[in-house]
UniProtKB/Swiss-Prot annotation:
Protein known as: Transcriptional repressor NrdR
Keywords tagged on the record: ATP-binding, DNA-binding, Metal-binding, Nucleotide-binding, Repressor, Transcription, Transcription regulation, Zinc, Zinc-finger
GO molecular function, one term: ATP binding
Zinc finger motifs (unnamed), residue ranges: 3-34
Gene: nrdR
Function according to Swiss-Prot or TrEMBL: Negatively regulates transcription of bacterial ribonucleotide reductase nrd genes and operons by binding to NrdR-boxes.
Organismal lineage: Bacteria, Pseudomonadati, Pseudomonadota, Alphaproteobacteria, Hyphomicrobiales
PROSITE patterns, A to Z: ATP_CONE
InterPro entries assigned to the protein according to its UniProt record, in alphabetical order: ATP-cone_dom (IPR005144), NrdR-like_N (IPR055173), RNR_NrdR-like (IPR003796)
Cofactor(s) of this protein: Zn(2+)
GO annotation terms (biological process): negative regulation of DNA-templated transcription
Signal peptide: none
Residue span, ATP-cone domain: 49-139
Co-factor note (free text): Binds 1 zinc ion.
Length: 160
């Protein structure tokens, strides 16, 4: 594994342990040249997924890109990073288990919104504003109404 600090390929694993309920191996590494320490994660990749963009372009699925978009929606929210990581892993597992070689970007966005809705309303709204391409304040009002209706529906289940 190449050192992210000096680019040397001579690194050693100092600690290795399971993470995310055994679905991931977390490794602490140290560079033998510069002494830099860093963490890597090893995951099973069932298949290479292609993302079909709205423009018709295809690109390889990038877990880091998914993580960055979710992190952006979660910015300055008090959410446990492990919970976010589990959500991302869950989305990736769902995508891989679909058995489709190509997945529309809209499907990925839908799965992210579904996941964020269970975690944090504000992050859900932030992500939705980009995913649904909000143009004005009424778009925000509509999604807040949608969330409020969902909460009211859930509360009415307990009133019965």
């Amino acid at each position: 594994m190449r050192c992210p600090y000096c680019q040397c390929e001579d690194t050693q694993v100092k600690d290795s342990r399971p993470a995310e309920e055994g679905a991931v191996i977390r490794r602490r590494r140290v560079c033998s040249v510069c002494g830099g320490r860093f963490t890597t994660f090893e995951r099973v990749q069932l298949r290479e997924l292609l993302v079909l963009k709205k423009s018709g372009r295809r690109e390889l699925f990038n877990r880091d890109k998914l993580m960055k978009s979710v992190d952006l929606a979660m910015r300055k929210r008090n959410i446990d990073p492990d919970r976010i990581e589990r959500a991302i892993s869950g989305i990736v597992r769902r995508l891989e288990s679909l058995g489709e070689p190509e997945i529309a970007s809209e499907k990925i966005g839908y799965l992210v919104m579904e996941s964020l809705k269970r975690i944090d309303d504000i992050a859900y709204i932030r992500f939705a504003s980009v995913y649904r391409d909000f143009r004005n304040a009424s778009d925000f009002h509509d999604i807040i109404d949608e969330l409020s209706k969902d909460v009211a529906d859930i509360e009415s289940c307990f009133d019965e």
